[in-house]
Amino acid sequence: TATTRRRGRPPGFSPFR
C-alpha cells in the first residue's frame, strides 16, 4: 500500500512504496 506516503515512514515500510 502507498498509504505510508502520507503517514511518513513506519518501521519495515518504505516512504516510496
UniProtKB/Swiss-Prot annotation:
GO biological process: regulation of blood pressure; vasodilation
Residues glycosylated per entry: T3, T4
The keyword Secreted is assigned to this record: yes
Tissue: Expressed by the venom gland.
Keywords: Bradykinin receptor impairing toxin, G-protein coupled receptor impairing toxin, Glycoprotein, Hypotensive agent, Secreted, Toxin, Vasoactive, Vasodilator
Residue runs in coiled coils: none
A cellular-component GO term for this protein: extracellular region
Localization of this protein: Secreted
GO molecular function: toxin activity
Task of the protein: Induces smooth muscle contraction. May target bradykinin receptors (BDKRB). May cause hypotension.
UniProt family annotation: Belongs to the bradykinin-related peptide family.
Name assigned to this protein: Vespulakinin-1
Species whose genome carries this gene: Vespula maculifrons (Eastern yellow jacket)
Lineage: Eukaryota, Metazoa, Ecdysozoa, Arthropoda, Hexapoda
